[in-house]
Design a protein with these regions (language model features):
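Helix-to-loop junction immediately C-terminal to a conserved catalytic motif
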Residues: 8
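Catalytic Walker B motif of ABC-type/P-loop ATPase nucleotide-binding domains
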Residues: 121-124
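Conserved signature/switch motifs of ABC ATPase nucleotide-binding domains
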Residues: 95-98, 116, 148
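ABC ATPase NBD coupling module
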Residues: 25-43, 73-74, 189-190
Length: 204
């Protein structure tokens, strides 16, 4: 989670670099212009949805388009309706967050991310606050996005999802990268002892 927040400049990194669109950025010292430029190409789906309680599902999706991107309201509404339809929430566009289940709120949050047409979506443990049944509906939306070619960086403990949908896995523990590689290599031929221990627990 901390790494993800540093990559989106929600927290300041102590050091390190990030390469985005062939541009290498010093994460400890990033000009505001660079932050704004990169954020326009990314979207963030939070663990606890982060929806505005006083706005409908539709308004939650249009807010960033109208306020952040200065888009005309009619165009923002059209894009928002399309995004809500994509996540199966078009019939709940006039509902407030309090009227939606956790899974439905997270799908609205994903629609909000899709609406800005990002190059990459960051997901911060998007199912950790959900019960198993609601987790399934959110993962189904994410699988569909993956199959459509959306680039996603996902912090997750959903190992089945990671195994079937990812093309690259990074296993971290206590802020340190333990192992990384292709999904196939990671799950079928792990190299590090700690990775093998972790996967053994998961497989049991």
């Amino acid at each position: 989670t901390t790494l993800l927040r540093c990559l989106n400049f929600l927290e300041k990194a102590d050091g390190g670099t990030m390469t985005f669109d062939d541009e290498t950025i010093d994460l400890h010292k990033v000009p505001k212009r660079t932050i704004a430029r990169i954020r326009k190409k990314t979207a963030f789906v939070f663990q606890n949805y982060n929806l505005f309680a006083n706005k409908t599902a539709l308004q939650n999706v249009t807010e960033g388009l109208i306020v952040g991107r200065k888009m005309p309201k009619d165009e923002a509404n059209r894009i928002a309706h399309e995004a809500l339809k994509k996540v199966g929430m078009e019939d709940r566009s006039d509902y407030y967050p309090s009227q939606l289940s956790g899974g439905q709120q997270q799908r609205v949050a994903i629609a909000r991310a899709i609406a800005v047409n990002p190059e990459i979506i960051y997901f911060d443990e998007p199912t950790s606050a959900l019960d198993p049944e609601l987790t399934v509906e959110v993962l189904a939306v994410m699988k569909r996005l993956a199959q459509e070619g959306m680039t996603m960086l996902v912090v997750t403990h959903e190992m089945n999802f990671a195994r079937t949908e990812s093309n690259r896995v990074i296993f971290m523990e206590k802020g340190v990268v333990v192992e990384q590689g292709s999904s196939k290599e990671f799950f079928e031929h792990p190299k590090e002892t700690r990775t093998k221990e972790f996967l053994r627990i998961f497989q049991e």
